[in-house]
Amino acid sequence: FDPLDGSSRDLPEKSVGADGRTTVLLHFEPTQALFLVLRDGEPTSTSGVNFPHLKPVMTVEGPWTVTFDAAWVKPLPPSVAPGSKEVSVAFDQLADWSKRPEDGIKWYSGVATYRKSFNLPAGVRPNRPMFLDIGVVKEMARVQLNGQDLGVAWCPPWRVAVPAGLLKASANQLVITVANTWNNRLCV
């Protein structure tokens, strides 16, 4: 049982020794916790693998549009008019805003929204369930794909499940809303 997302699964890769002890093959992501529930007498699957190997299908590359609450961007970039509600910045790739050269962005503390449109490469079947790995996030991120909320990633492995059929061949809209802590602003 995975307490992070509430999922559970059979663990077919197991053996029971002559002494009655059960040995189960487990795989943990860094800092991950799982509950192992052993039940007497309940049939479980004996074929398959405990933890399927996830293989990358594609990388969402290219520019992202990132918006920040202008009230918390200090100093404002020269291109932003005083009184603006948002500051919109183009990032070359999905990246940590605290690594940006602009002081108002680098020291920003609050919520920022990353937006990206992308197409699936030829050969990728959108009718299969997948995972979206968003890399390391500081501190948490809510992920939406094509208008559907995929949940919050707040610890490793920094990924969310993408239900079968949600992806389209083209014009997929990915929105990642990231929140950090005041620590970033206090470092100034």
Model-based region annotation:
Residues F1-T22, K138, Q144-V160:
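Solvent-exposed beta-strand/loop surfaces of large extracellular or lumenal domains
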Residues G20-T44:
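C-terminal beta-strand-rich structural cap/linker in extracellular carbohydrate-active enzymes
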Residues F28-E29, L166-A169:
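Surface-exposed, short loops/turns at beta-strand junctions within beta-sandwich domains
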Residues A33, N127, A169-A171:
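Extracellular Ig-like/FN3 beta-sandwich strand-entry sites
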Residues L34-G41, K116, Q173-N180:
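Short, hydrophobic/aromatic-enriched beta-strand segments in well-ordered soluble domains
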Residues T44-G110, K168-V188:
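An acidic-aromatic loop/edge-strand motif
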Residues W107, F118-L120, V124-N146, L174-V178:
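Aromatic-lined ligand-binding clefts that engage carbohydrates, nucleic acids, or primary amines
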Residues Y108-A122, W158-A161:
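Short beta-strands within extracellular/lumenal beta-sheet-rich domains
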